[in-house]
C-alpha cells in the first residue's frame, strides 16, 4: 500500500504529532519535527492491544508473548499455548491457534466466557482447548524465552506456577483482553464513545467539519484490515469531494 500511494504522488513524512488545532478552517498539526496545515485531515491512527498487565510482560513481547494469532501462530507449532481473555476475540483466536499448537488453554478472570454462544460451543467442543477459570496472569519469566508463568486464582488467592515442557523450551502466551484506541492528541478534539473510539457517520465525518476518521480508531463493529481499507477509501472520496467545492 505504501508503494501504491507513492505511485500516485503521495508525500510520506515520519513525525510524531504532539498537538492538534482542529477548530478553524485550516487544521494545524504540530509535530516534533515540523508543523503541518490542511483544510481536511483523516485520523487513521489505529488501536493497539490492551496489555495483559503482568510482571515481565514488556521483556517477553516477541519472546513468547504475542497479541496476534494470525501473525505468530506458526511460531508455536506443536507447542503449548495460553490465551488471556474470554471475549469473542480471545475465543476465536484460541480456536485458530488449535490449528498449530498441540494444546491451547484459555485463562479467564471470570467463571464463564463472554464470547458469543456459538463461538463458546466450538471452543468447548474442541479437544485441544482447556480452561483456567477465575484466573489472571501475574508474572512471566524465562531464560530469554517465555518459560515460566504464575497464574493467580482471584477467588481463592491461590497461585499456580506453569512451566514449559523441557523438550519444548518455551510456551506461548497470547493476550486478547481488548483494544485501546490510539487517539492521542485527538482524544479531546473530536467526539468519542465511552471507550475512546472516535464517532463518525457512514461517510467517516467526525463532529468537527473537515476532520475524518478511518480504521480501528473509530467506532465500528468489525476491526480488520479489509474494513480499515474501506474506511480509508470512503474518507478519501469525501475529502476529494469537499476540495472540489473550492
Regions found by a protein language model. Name each.
Residues 94-95:
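Generic hydrophobic/aromatic pocket-lining and core-packing "Φ" positions
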